[in-house]
Amino acid sequence: GVPCLCDSDGPSVRGNTLSGTLWLFGCPSGWHNCKAHGPTIGWCCKK
């Protein structure tokens, strides 16, 4: 999957670890949305 920035990773992509994974159709079972304001497309989720 495509990595994405969770709220817990920090305010910006630069210099931070992207611990989330981008899912187009919502987070799969056992995952949770880790970004309060999601990306333009899809959801940023992590296990």
UniProtKB/Swiss-Prot annotation:
GO CC terms: extracellular region; nematocyst
Gene3D superfamilies hit by this protein: Anthopleurin-A (2.20.20.10)
Chief site of localization: secreted
GO molecular function terms listed in the Swiss-Prot or TrEMBL record: sodium channel regulator activity; toxin activity
Keyword check for Secreted: yes
InterPro entries, A to Z: Anenome_toxin, Myo_ane_neurotoxin_sf
The keyword Disulfide bond is annotated on this UniProt entry: yes
GO BP, sorted A to Z: regulation of signal transduction
Family that this chain belongs to: Belongs to the sea anemone sodium channel inhibitory toxin family. Type I subfamily.
Name of the molecule in the record: Delta-actitoxin-Aspp1d
Organism: Anthopleura sp. (strain 'Zhanjiang')
